[in-house]
A protein has these predicted regions:
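Active-site neighborhood of HAD-like aspartate-dependent phosphohydrolases
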Residues: 2-52
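Asp-based, Mg2+/Mn2+-dependent phosphohydrolase catalytic module
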Residues: 2-4, 8, 68-86, 94-124, ...
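Substrate-recognition element of Asp-dependent hydrolases with the DxDx(T/V) motif
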Residues: 37, 41-74, 83-96, 135
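Metal-dependent phosphoesterase signature
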Residues: 14-35, 60-69, 79, 92-99
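A short alpha-helix capping/helix-coil boundary motif
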Residues: 18-21, 54-56, 86-88, 109-112
């Protein structure tokens, strides 16, 4: 596994991380992988690590999507980028107070339970602060891959920031994600 130590899985946010974010997307035909996603996932799998998707889908609670539409989009993501070993989806809204919606750690903990591994054996890659907060709360390693919707304070607060999904996977497989803050490929001064 070269440099991954006790890492056994990499979990990913869906929208804005693995696929181009289409707000409240219920149409599988609109699913487009992020640049480099296919190759990045292949590297993770070749390293012998499990993969999974952890995604907030509040469009269900808001009445903008059905559970079936979310499942249909997820099937398309799996066709293009999978197979994934585990899927966790939160259909709740921000005010619902559930334990699964990121930044709560519930979905990451559930994914780890399904995989039979400890959260500490997992890395989580996402594009917003709630992703990093969920991973941290679960005890997993977090990597932020900023997009235009990522706020500067979320970038500043993240311990590890990768320039894109491929770079995130390089950091994870290189075993450096617990050791450095990497911004745009440059190590932060000690």
């Amino acid at each position: 596994m070269g440099g991954t130590g006790t890492l056994k899985a990499v979990l990913f946010d869906r929208d804005g991380t693995l696929v181009v974010d289409v707000p409240y997307n219920g149409d599988p035909q609109l699913v487009r992988p992020m640049d480099g996603a296919v190759a990045a996932l292949q590297k993770v799998r070749e390293a012998g690590l499990a993969t999974g998707v952890v995604s907030n889908q509040s469009g269900v609670a808001r009445g903008l999507l059905t559970v079936d539409q979310v499942a249909s989009v997820n099937r398309r993501v799996d066709q293009l980028l999978g197979p994934f070993d585990v899927w966790e989806v939160c259909p709740h809204g921000p005010a619902d107070g559930c334990a699964c919606r990121k930044p709560a750690p519930g979905m990451i903990l559930s994914a780890c339970e399904t995989l039979g591994i400890a959260p500490e054996e997992t890395a989580f890659v996402g594009d917003i602060g709630a992703d990093v907060e969920a991973a941290t709360a679960a005890g997993s390693r977090a990597v932020l891959v900023p997009t235009p919707v990522t706020r500067q304070e979320e970038i500043d607060a993240a311990e590890v920031v990768a320039r894109d999904l491929s770079h995130a996977v390089e950091l994870i497989l290189g075993g450096s994600i617990a050791l450095e803050k990497d911004t745009a490929g440059q190590e932060a001064p000690a």
